């Protein structure tokens, strides 16, 4: 009986040894095949011309220059473009079919006629009260007016950035701004904003909390106001609430599907002086003021370059959504 058990054990050990030998032999054979294959590739590679799917960059020149891959999908074939312009443009052109004409011209740049939308606004002030940006890409034309420089800058800051806003109850509470990204934004037919900074005892600094006439006036009868005060200091506010709504807002970052185009003017609007605003000159540009036909021709010519500086976004903007989450 013991002899049978020894035979079984011996047979098992011999099987294990044979299996181990076979596996090692297979491993050596595979190594030989792989190394031989790699050697052949190394020898033949100088004589082969493989397809390079990268983008060729020049050895010399500025590496800051953007090189676009021409094989990428053309975004305008599946996107919508809104063009916002002042009503005076249509008045000067005086042609009932001018929008159809421009649509046909946009078609030559690859934009289907059904993807272009023209939106008129009366003036900067009225547009700032009720901005509506619904397209995948939005181009806002603003004619330069020396008397409205601040209004234009604030509107550009509003449109080119995303804001998270909450209501303010200025009758019950004091408010303070926590950092540079924190602003108070007011909208309405007439916004007059007065502030009174408070010390740690909630006493006015240079003003009386019980007398609004002693408050500092930071805006008078404006339709759009972006108020910036000293951070970390409580303020008592006085606002014309019957004609204006004020919100406590936080700047989240750039709204990359919007570009502002200044039409004419010797001075160029720039909102990048705000330390919370990243440089965005590519989405804020100027065209020379001639005639409105000339302005629109210029936009058609450069529309694709302008869109390349933008990003398609699905989030829309209107005055109601802006107050809470943009």
Curated annotation (Swiss-Prot):
Region of interest called CNP motif, as start-end residue ranges on this chain: 165-167
Subcellular location: Virion; Host endoplasmic reticulum lumen
Signal peptide: 1-50
Post-translational modification: N-glycosylated.
Region called GPR motif, residue ranges: 253-255
Keyword Transport: no
UniProt keyword annotation of Signal present: yes
Function statement: Calcium-binding protein that interacts with rotavirus cell receptors once the initial attachment by VP4 has been achieved. Rotavirus attachment and entry into the host cell probably involves multiple sequential contacts between the outer capsid proteins VP4 and VP7, and the cell receptors. Following entry into the host cell, low intracellular or intravesicular Ca(2+) concentration probably causes the calcium-stabilized VP7 trimers to dissociate from the virion. This step is probably necessary for the membrane-disrupting entry step and the release of VP4, which is locked onto the virion by VP7.
Note: Some rotavirus strains are neuraminidase-sensitive and require sialic acid to attach to the cell surface. Some rotavirus strains are integrin-dependent. Some rotavirus strains depend on ganglioside for their entry into the host cell. Hsp70 also seems to be involved in the entry of some strains. In group A rotaviruses, VP7 defines the G serotype.
Family: Belongs to the rotavirus VP7 family.
UniProt name for this protein: Outer capsid glycoprotein VP7
Organism: Rotavirus A (strain RVA/Human/Japan/YO/1977/G3P1A[8]) (RV-A)
